[in-house]
Amino acid sequence: MYLPAQKAICPFLFTIIGLSAPLGVCASEKLSGTPIGTVDGFDYEHNRVVKNIQGRAFDGNLNTYFATNERSYTWVGLDLGTPHVISRVGWSPRDDWHGPQRVQLGVIQGANREDFLDAVPIYMITEEGVIGEMSYGDVNCSKGFRYVRFVSTSDARCNIAELEFYGSEGEGADDGYFSLTSLPTVCINTIDAAEPYDKEHNISCNVIIIHDGEIDTDAAASVRERGNYSRTFPKKPWRIKFDKKQNVLDAPAKAKKWTLINNYGDKTLMRNLLAFEIGRRFEMPYVPWGRAVDVILNGEYKGCYQLCDQVEVNPGRLDITEMEPEDVSGDALTGGYFIEVDAYAYDEPEGEWFTSAYHSIPVTIKSPDDGGTKEQYDYIRDYFSNLENMVFSNQFGRNGKDYRDIFDVDSFIRHMLVGELSGNTDTYWSTYMYKDRGDDVIHTGPIWDFDIAFENDNRTYPIHTRVGKNRYLFETEMASAANGMADFARRIVKSDSRSKEDIKRIWSIARNDNHLSAKELNEYVDALAEMLNESQKLNFLRWPIMNQMVHQNPVISGNYKREVERVKSYLKDRFSDLDKLIGYDSSISAVEEITSEEASIIKDIRVSGNMISSLAGNNFAVYSVSGALVYSGADTTSALPSGIYIVKTMKGSMKVVI
């Protein structure tokens, strides 16, 4: 975490943790080396490009300066010859009207490769500089580096009058790396500092993820832009593809592809994470993993992002059969398919999307890759079109024809309810579905893309008064949907009389068994806000949009706390409206009750005495009645105190009385 800068009369008088320096004696010394940095400098006085003026940042003269011709991804530093552990840095801005602001959010990096592909941050300047004065900051990084540099924030032309490094020679240790905040720091270092510029071209890079003072991930990769409308924002979203599969942080999947969601229009920076938590409380079989992170690209601080699963067929993600080109007949041809009802499908390459036969619903084939073979393409197109035909027929279970035979209605309802509770205008603009091999049923999920949900869309704001308690959001003229998809949803939710009880059952079970309430979700929101607090401050220094309308923002709240409170207030109203619309029943539960008076076995769970175990060694979780996690794993629990517990497995939930 960063420390505030300090003004110093004499930077030599300070104490290193664990080592006391006598008065007037430095425990680490001011370092010298060969000045390095961006070659093309700029002379403001003569309005011209000048070469190799890096030395001006180290000449001890606050009246000279280093500046670059290029506006972004420019830097200046030292080649120290050998690795040094840096203990302190000093800086002073160029004497200019914008000088003090141009050093703010500047990142100090260390590296041991001349190309800086292994660069990591060792300090971040979080305050404006002072013209004519040196400011100093203590560095908390145990690793030694040969190359050190200052990288200015974007569009600042690396304007700096003086730069100083203090430290001592040594390789250092790998147990004390610096992070920008308490969140993980993701460092993307591309070859030749190339910036990703579109969705088609992958830029080779190295990705380093720092968490809790250690390197979590350090691997070769490529990076490109991702997304559709989100790509139009100045804060760009990216996709990372590692050369080899990686385990990242606490994500359940080992995979090559990962996304960095920019959350530009979401001033809480948490809406996607909140929606994913709601999906988990609805017990959806796969909810994308996500984690808030700070991102640095080629030394430039880019803001707070969400590192997230690439939604794809992969163990630990959408765990269905991955098809091969030779899977063109018999049972092999039946799956697995991962598709997206997609309003943007028309922009995809030919052969990777289709429109359904009867109502022209646009569908993109996400897996198999490139739309698959002709046989695979034809199979899933025809299968989806048959489902569509059955949904729009009037024979719901009559004459032996029922769309429910090939469509998982429960998964569709769970997906719909996440969209309704979150107030997601775009629920049916983009809707994922999948079909596995040997399974006749198409399932709905996973959920995705909630940056304009939770009262963040001027087309529907305020949902409480404009949608109310007598209809669903997706039914209204305000909601957006891919062609034909809103009618598809209406047929299932409104025309099929069985769905009303299904919705009531699924909603009530989630409310009663899975801590789905305004109170408990707002506690989760508060926890996210606390976790994000340091990072959001830096993010909105980098992107000063808090008092601007961006994307679909309906109102300007003015500060982070009020943005968060608006989400919490919305949840209270939305639960009230949906409880009335759905007919919430507090007596409906899916939890089976068993006691430990004698050994009991239900759904693979064995209760013996005051211990709980899984017969098959499967993962299960034990919660107290207050919702606190007591145990998670596949082994036998320790002896539990007498009381009531909720045990959750992939097969369901149960109440255990010990």
Residue ranges of predicted features:
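Disordered, acidic Ser/Thr/Pro-rich linker "stalks" and the adjacent N-terminal cap
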Residues: S28-G81, R94-Q101, E127, E169-A173
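Trp- and acidic/polar-enriched beta-sheet ligand-binding modules for extracellular glycan
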Residues: E70-T74, W97-E169
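Extended extracellular/luminal ectodomain segments enriched in beta-structured repeat modules
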Residues: S72-Y73, G81-G90, G144-F145, A255
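A short beta-strand element within beta-rich, extracytoplasmic domains
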Residues: H84-W97, F150
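Middle-to-C-terminal accessory/interaction subdomains
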Residues: P196, A219-A220, Y229, F233-P234, ...
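Conserved oxyanion/phosphate-binding beta-strand-loop segments in alpha/beta enzyme cores
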Residues: C205-N262
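Internal "kinase-insert"/substrate-recognition segments embedded within catalytic cores
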Residues: K241, Q246-N247, A255, N262-N263, ...
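C-terminal outer-membrane/trafficking sorting elements
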Residues: I594-I658
